[in-house]
Amino acid sequence: MDRSGYFPVLDEDIPTKSELRLPLESKTSSRSRRWLHLVLVLQFVLIISLLASLHILGNRQPSNITCAKQLSPYSPYLEDGDLELEEFTELNHLMQPSPYRGQPTPEIEEAWVRLWRVPMIGFPETKMINLNKTNPQDYAHVSTRYGDDMLGFLNVFHQLHCLNLVRQYTYRDDYDYSNVTAFRAPQELVRGHIDHCIETIRKSIMCASDVTPVVFQLDDSRKSGFKSDFNMRRTCRNFDKIQDWAVANAVQGDFE
């Protein structure tokens, strides 16, 4: 055998196992670093997105319906989401004309009746628990031919009825109210009805507790040098829409 081209292989010329694995391990390490970078970037994006979402949620104003539901017990009107707020400055000085004030006339009486006399409504029996009524069977229902709803009406109309009755009571010697059922009862019951209405109005006012500041306008004609300015800025529920809703959702037919 021709050994002229043969050179002995020395031990140091043979690559070790670790040296043979080096390229593979280098590739693996590089791939791991890329995945780590990707994970860090994704985490960063996620954190930024979360912070942005929290900022948006924290600065978003709740809707009128959301606020109303937090401040009121259950109401089928609020469930329908038809609440509308109005902002305005009312005119309400001491002698401010109004279709609802002054010496009784047929027109004034009719105007008051149109405020509070609306049909009754129905709402689901399952909602009675939201009104803290645990025995629905003890309360009037709509006739079964129209469903199994509870029979009721919105409290604002009871409050207006009470205010009207107190108004009429103050004019009972100046106007013929013989057609008013409440005044045909025995005097003790009439007085009790009026006192009930005064309590209803008192509680309603205290419950709402309007905290809008009343300011004083300078007036040299007054001994005090100023007068209360009752032309106040108001934010109110749109009463016409509430009344329209009650009429549109009126219960028809006989009641049980």
Swiss-Prot record:
Keyword annotations for this protein? Glycoprotein, Membrane, Oxidoreductase, Transmembrane, Transmembrane helix, Virulence
- Pfam families attached here? UstYa (PF11807)
Phenotype of the disruptant? Abolishes the formation of phomopsin A and leads to the accumulation an intermediate with no modified Ile moiety.
Query: What's its EC?
Result: 1.-.-.-
Carbohydrate attachment sites? Answer: N64, N132, N179
Instruction: Tell me which InterPro entries the record gives.
Output: UstYa-like
Q: Where is this motif: HXXHC 1?
A: 158-162
Q: Where in the cell is it found?
A: Membrane
GO BP term, example:
mycotoxin biosynthetic process
The Swiss-Prot or TrEMBL record annotates one GO molecular function as: oxidoreductase activity
Query: Which chain regions cross the lipid bilayer?
Result: 38-58
Q: Broadest EC class?
A: oxidoreductase
Find motif (HXXHC 2) and give its ranges: 193-197
- Signal peptide extent: none
On whether Coiled coil is a keyword of this UniProt record, the answer is no
Q: In which pathway does it act?
A: Mycotoxin biosynthesis
User: Which GO cellular component terms are attached?
Assistant: membrane
Q: How does it sit in the membrane?
A: Single-pass membrane protein
What family is this?
A: Belongs to the ustYa family.
Please describe what this protein does.
Answer: UstYa family oxidase; part of the gene cluster that mediates the biosynthesis of the phomopsins, a group of hexapeptide mycotoxins which infects lupins and causes lupinosis disease in livestock. Within the pathway, phomYc catalyzes the desaturation of the Ile moiety into 2,3-dehydroisoleucine (dIle). The pathway starts with the processing of the precursor phomA by several endopeptidases including kexin proteases as well as the cluster-specific S41 family peptidase phomP1 and the oligopeptidase phomG to produce 10 identical copies of the hexapeptide Tyr-Val-Ile-Pro-Ile-Asp.
- Comment block on domains: The 2 HXXHC motifs are conserved in ustYa family proteins and might form active sites.
Q: What PANTHER family does the annotation carry?
A: CYCLOCHLOROTINE BIOSYNTHESIS PROTEIN O, YALI0B05434P
What's the name of the protein?
UstYa family oxidase phomYc
The species this protein belongs to is Diaporthe leptostromiformis
Q: Quote the gene name from the UniProt entry.
A: phomYc
